[in-house]
Regions:
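Structural detector for internal amphipathic alpha-helices that build alpha-solenoid repeat scaffolds
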Residues: 1-3, 10, 18-33, 42, ...
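Short inter-helical turns and helix N-cap capping residues of alpha-solenoid HEAT/ARM repeat scaffolds
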Residues: 15-16, 48-49, 78-79, 110-111, ...
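Short, contiguous alpha-helical
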Residues: 39
């Protein structure tokens, strides 16, 4: 284990998926280098274990623009955990060119975690093209997605945002209400 922490890159090729995930974490914790980014990117695209691919994809969010091409290719992965991780990485990178894909994922009927990650990424990026879908989602989506939309909307300076957040502060779901109340204050019933 000490060897993994000292030099995690060789462990990216370990036969045990758990060790590969630990190596990815150690690469991130020690700061992504060109060598570790190359290894993590390879795992993101080629590993047989979906959890490893997802963890590697999310780690690439800390690799800067050099990771964008890999993340773009991962959009076609069959594992929804990878889609969630790609969305998270795009948000960390504030990658504006991903906004159309993120909008599609946020508004789609995919798994909830991927939709949440896409909404969070749209908020992190702050592109005005996302505003209409975020306004729709804050009013009509699963509760976890509505809650994420509340937070995402806080970065937009648009006259439609405050009424949407005030409505969310009266949402039937307590987690959505709480998130909105933190932004606009408690609303009378």
């Amino acid at each position: 284990m000490v060897r993994l922490l000292d030099d995690p890159v060789p462990f990216l090729d370990h036969p045990d998926a758990e060790v590969r995930r630990l190596a990815i974490s150690a690469c991130v914790a020690s700061g992504l280098t060109d060598e570790s980014v190359a290894g993590v990117a390879r795992l993101a695209g080629e590993d047989v274990d979906g959890a490893v691919r997802a963890m590697a994809a999310e780690a690439l969010g800390g690799a800067g623009q050099r990771a964008v091409a890999v993340l773009d290719a991962l959009r076609s992965d069959d594992d929804p955990r990878v889609h969630e991780a790609v969305a998270t990485a795009y948000g960390e990178l504030k990658h504006g060119e991903a906004v159309p894909w993120l909008i599609e994922m946020a508004a789609g009927d995919g798994d909830r975690a991927s939709r949440e990650a896409a909404v969070a990424a749209l908020g992190a990026i702050g592109d005005g093209a996302a505003l209409p879908v975020l306004l729709d989602l804050v009013a009509d989506a699963p509760p976890q997605v509505r809650r994420r939309a509340v937070v995402a909307l806080t970065v937009f300076d648009d006259s439609a945002v405050e009424p949407a957040l005030r409505n969310a502060a009266r949402d039937r779901n307590p987690s959505v209400r709480e998130a909105a109340e933190m932004v606009v204050g408690r609303q009378p019933d």
